[in-house]
């Protein structure tokens, strides 16, 4: 009986360790890709993160994780998109803990190795509006970040210098969202 328990623990540890894939010199996790509609990058990234966690928990994507549902609930005409505070609130209302912070390059490897994708805000040039993407991978040796960019494609490779320039324009805004632990019975 005791050896069966340790076998289960060993199997669980292996499964946790393989939630991401090791690239040649980097690390990435398989976050579902959602393409955006016009002004819908915020809805698309929230959808990607929600679908990722629902899949990790063995659930099908819920209606609340559909990008159209998110877009209708959160779109602001004045912003021509979705405010970051609205994304946080939506995630919290749908069972997630959120933490918005000014990120650093090393945060990516640490969180991705824990199986946690990150949402980032980017500003590609001084005249453009904000754009949201999901950091799904990082390759520190080649100085690359792998983005699920809802306007472009899944696992878009971007050089660190270009990425950090666009990210710095948003004060390195980063959002971590993880599922709330199930309520414990007393």
Identify the role of each PLM range.
Residues 7-17:
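Bacterial N-terminal signal peptides
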Residues 23-32, 64-185:
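Conserved active-site-adjacent core of cysteine acyl-enzyme catalytic domains
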Residues 29-59:
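N-terminal targeting signals for Sec/Tat export/insertion, comprising classic cleavable signal peptides
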């Amino acid at each position: 009986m005791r050896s069966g328990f340790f076998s289960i623990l060993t199997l669980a540890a292996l499964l946790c360790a393989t939630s991401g894939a090791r690239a040649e010199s980097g690390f990435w996790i398989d976050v579902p890709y959602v393409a955006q509609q016009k002004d819908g990058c915020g809805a698309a990234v929230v959808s990607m993160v929600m679908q990722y966690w629902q899949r990790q928990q063995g659930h099908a994507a819920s209606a609340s994780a559909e990008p159209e549902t998110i877009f209708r609930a959160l779109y602001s005409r004045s912003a021509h998109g979705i405010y970051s505070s609205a994304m946080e609130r939506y995630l919290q209302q749908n069972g997630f803990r959120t933490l918005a912070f000014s990120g650093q390059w090393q945060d990516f490897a640490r969180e991705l190795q824990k199986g946690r994708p990150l949402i980032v805000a980017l500003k590609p040039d001084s005249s453009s509006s904000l754009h949201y993407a999901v950091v799904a991978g990082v390759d520190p040796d080649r100085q690359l970040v792998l983005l699920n960019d809802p306007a472009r494609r899944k696992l878009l490779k971007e050089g660190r210098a270009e990425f950090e320039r666009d990210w710095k324009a948003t004060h390195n805004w980063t959002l971590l969202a993880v599922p709330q632990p199930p309520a414990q019975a007393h």
